[in-house]
Regions:
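Domain-length cofactor-binding catalytic modules of enzymes
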Residues: 1-191
Length: 191
């Protein structure tokens, strides 16, 4: 198996931030019409109506971009290596299943019989799994075990030497200061 783990290259975050700002502005406009303005954090504001439809539309474009990006990377590597594809599939995480309106943050689709990948960390690899289709879990599975440290905490707590030591025996061109926030020790262990 060869796994390509990449997303939209920051584009999804920019689209989400745009609509979060729009939601906050709409809330402020509504509150300006009222006497009492309750404080609602920006992160809890949401869009509705046409803005919601526009957001879903734009996120579909971002998700298609990420899918095509992974496909291009895979096709290029396969061609250059002279490999033959026996089977391929994509698993995406931190996205909106726009067909079923399921937000998957930290999870992946796991419909009954669906093949999926659950990445553990850069050292321990990924699990190739088959979905169970559990409606109580929104037909989802976890995207890995989760973080122990946030990205900023990891940069303060983990040194490059510790990172390199944890990756001994694993080939990677990505063990560097700028990827400390992805080092194995910032994630929960598999067990």
């Amino acid at each position: 198996w060869r796994v390509i783990h990449t997303g939209s290259g920051h584009l999804g975050l920019e689209v989400a931030k745009y609509y979060q700002e729009l939601a906050y502005k709409q809330l402020k406009d509504i509150n300006a019409l009222k006497m009492h303005e309750p404080h609602i954090p920006k992160s809890l504001c949401y869009v509705s109506g046409q803005a919601f439809k526009d957001y879903i539309h734009d996120m579909e474009i971002v998700q298609k971009y990420a899918e095509l990006n992974r496909k291009y990377i895979a096709d290029t590597v396969i061609e250059k290596m002279g490999w033959h594809i026996c089977e391929e599939f994509q698993t995406i995480h931190n996205y909106i299943d726009t067909k079923n309106l399921i937000l998957r943050k930290g999870s992946v689709s796991a419909r009954d019989g669906e093949k999926l990948i659950i990445p553990i960390n850069m050292r321990d690899g990924s699990l190739i799994c088959v979905g169970k289709g559990n409606p109580d879990w929104n037909y989802s599975a976890p995207h890995g075990a989760g973080r122990i440290l946030s990205r900023s905490e990891a940069k303060d707590a983990v040194g490059i030497d510790e990172f390199r030591e944890s990756m001994k025996g694993i080939y990677s061109s990505s063990v560097m200061e700028s990827t400390i926030d992805e080092s194995p020790m910032v994630y929960k262990p598999m067990d």
